Amino acid sequence: MKKSFFEYLMTQRNPQPNNEVEEFANQAFFDQVFPKQSRDFDEISKYLELNAGYLQSMSIFDSAWQRYLESEQF
C-alpha cells in the first residue's frame, strides 16, 4: 500500500534538521489540519500555500514531493 505524502514526510523528521525538507517535516508534524491522508499534489500544494506559514518557500515542498515520488517507485 502506498504511503500518503504526510506519512512519507514524517520519515524525514530530524530533531537536529540538516536541510529544509527535514525542517519542513518537523513543522508539519505540529500542523493539526495538514491533509494527512492525501496523495494528491494539487490538494497538498493548495493547502500549504494558504495555511503553512512555517514553509518558507514552495520549492521546499516541491523537493519533498520529488523525494516522495522517488520513494514510491520501490
From Swiss-Prot:
**UniProt-listed HAMAP family:** UPF0346
Lineage, top-rank taxon, reads: Bacteria
The Swiss-Prot or TrEMBL record describes its family as follows: Belongs to the UPF0346 family.
Pfam families in UniProt: YozE_SAM_like (PF06855)
Name of the protein? UPF0346 protein PEPE_1063
Q: Which InterPro entries match?
A: UPF0346, YozE_SAM-like, YozE_SAM-like_sf
